[in-house]
């Protein structure tokens, strides 16, 4: 099995308090499932048609681990706490 990289791009954040509460739950839930956080924050530089918005880069040991992490009860609870306070996009790619 190859590693998987997950890129999360935030398009809009409407409530910073809910985002902070989400992060307190989401980080440990994802780490428990095997996630390694590689980068998080606002890009220092964007090119072409890029938008400087909050971005997270995560490494997973496998597709299965990424799926199980997202679908875990603890991560789903984090999503409930987020309560729509962020519009974001998740992308998953197999490592080379």
Task: Give the label of every model feature segment.
Residues 1-55, 61-71, 94-96:
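Short S/T/G/P-rich N-terminal loop/turn motif that feeds into the first structured element of a domain
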Residues 66-91:
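C-terminal structural segments of small proteins and small subunits
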């Amino acid at each position: 099995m190859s590693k998987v990289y997950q890129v999360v791009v935030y398009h809009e954040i409407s409530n910073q308090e809910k985002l902070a509460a989400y992060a307190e739950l989401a980080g440990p839930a994802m780490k428990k499932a095997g996630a390694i956080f590689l980068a998080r924050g606002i890009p220092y530089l964007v090119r072409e048609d890029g938008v400087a918005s909050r971005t997270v880069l995560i490494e997973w040991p496998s597709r299965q681990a990424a799926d199980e992490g997202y679908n875990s009860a603890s991560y789903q609870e984090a999503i409930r706490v987020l309560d729509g306070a962020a519009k974001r996009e998740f992308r998953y790619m197999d490592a080379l």
